[in-house]
Amino acid sequence: MSTSFENKATNRGIITFTISQDEIKPALDQAFNKVKKDLNVPGFRKGHMPRTVFNQKFGEEALYENALNLVLPKAYEAAVAELGLDVVAQPKIDVVSMEKGQDWKLTAEVVTKPEVKLGDYKDLSVEVDASKEVSAEEVDAKVERERNNLAELTVKDGEAAQGDTVVIDFVGSVDGVEFDGGKGDNFSLELGSGQFIPGFEEQLVGSKAGQTVDVNVTFPEDYQAEDLAGKDAKFVTTIHEVKTKEVPALDDELAKDIDDEVETLDELKAKYRKELESAKEIAFDDAVEGAAIELAVANAEIVELPEEMVHDEVHRAMNEFMGNMQRQGISPEMYFQLTGTTEEDLHKQYQADADKRVKTNLVIEAIAAAEGFEATDEEIEKEITDLASEYNMEADQVRGLLSADMLKHDIAMKKAVDVITSSATVK
């Protein structure tokens, strides 16, 4: 193979490479065997036309496109490897020449990984908005949340107050015309929960069972149903019942109802304190890691980030997100319907910080390379085992989904992150 690389601009260039006859001939044979299956030519049974007859009738050139598709991926990868390039986006391939009996000549317009000039990434001093300390108020708040979860709703006489639940029928209209989705029967609405659009729930405070209230509201400008956004609406609302929460007493019996592993309220609080301390420890470590990585990235210099890398990152993140949704049984169509968003909205969401994610990955990769981090066989096996456990899969399934190179890359990246964070100190 003959290869060359011509630099055209920062992180951009053109590879010129050839595909030899030794590679072309077997590819032409494969292409012919594939094509002839569908050929129906008088004088021959379907799929049994001789190669010589095919060449006479159609010309060998008729096989070139199929043959090129067979040999191109391997030839391109070999050219990139021979030149020692780190290509980061799909190439634009052009054919220079494909003549019978001659090596084929092609060019590939490529984008290469930008140069990263590392700054300080060890012994960094960072500030974090997080604490490991757990206050008595935080413990009490957790107990109170669990206590409220055990609250029972009972029907009450009198006016509905904030926090009460009202059982209602409602019919919505705009300019006197009812609209789709604006009607409900026997709907339980907790006042102050924010379930309905702003202004709705507040107008039911003070209402009583048996009353009908005209609730006048304005739909938000960014409301998901565009035909209603920004419009004034009236909901004729009938209150059937008003219910209030009755929470159990704050005592040892409550503690046992919440957690059958404790006997007293003090034991429950002690258990919650440990849980909160553990969660805060993790959150604190995550905050330190995030701040240290952000500072290491800020200290580095990246020469012109290719837009193709950002584009690919947006689509990678979107595909990963939608894949997670589908594993939960939620199709893209269902997700967009439930959230009132579009694919374009999701694209904008991931576009917002795609630059930052790409730069972060580039800097961490550069640190891994600078430190000479590599993955051992034992580390690869442990990574496979950990992933299998995390996603409830068999180890062989993980091996089938992730190549050894991907696993090695991920392990090296984790080591680089550890170098950054383990030496960082908090101001």
Swiss-Prot record:
Major enzyme class: isomerase
Entry keyword set: Cell cycle, Cell division, Chaperone, Cytoplasm, Isomerase, Rotamase
Residue span, PPIase FKBP-type domain: 163-248
InterPro entries for the chain: PPIase_dom_sf, PPIase_FKBP_dom, Trig_fac, Trigger_fac_C, Trigger_fac_C_sf, Trigger_fac_ribosome-bd_bac, Trigger_fac_ribosome-bd_sf, Trigger_fact/SurA_dom_sf
Stated role: Involved in protein export. Acts as a chaperone by maintaining the newly synthesized protein in an open conformation. Functions as a peptidyl-prolyl cis-trans isomerase.
GO cellular component: cytoplasm
Record protein name field: Trigger factor
Domain notes: Consists of 3 domains; the N-terminus binds the ribosome, the middle domain has PPIase activity, while the C-terminus has intrinsic chaperone activity on its own.
PANTHER family: TRIGGER FACTOR CHAPERONE AND PEPTIDYL-PROLYL CIS/TRANS ISOMERASE (PTHR30560), TRIGGER FACTOR-LIKE PROTEIN TIG, CHLOROPLASTIC (PTHR30560:SF3)
Subcellular location: Cytoplasm
Molecular function in Gene Ontology: peptidyl-prolyl cis-trans isomerase activity; protein folding chaperone; ribosome binding
Entries under Pfam families matching the protein: FKBP_C, Trigger_C, Trigger_N
E.C. number(s) listed in UniProt: 5.2.1.8
Source species, domain of life: Bacteria
Catalysis performed (reactions): [protein]-peptidylproline (omega=180) = [protein]-peptidylproline (omega=0)
PROSITE patterns found in the cross-reference section: FKBP_PPIASE
Record's keyword annotation contains Isomerase: yes
Family stated for the protein in its record: Belongs to the FKBP-type PPIase family. Tig subfamily.
Biological process per Gene Ontology, one example term: cell division
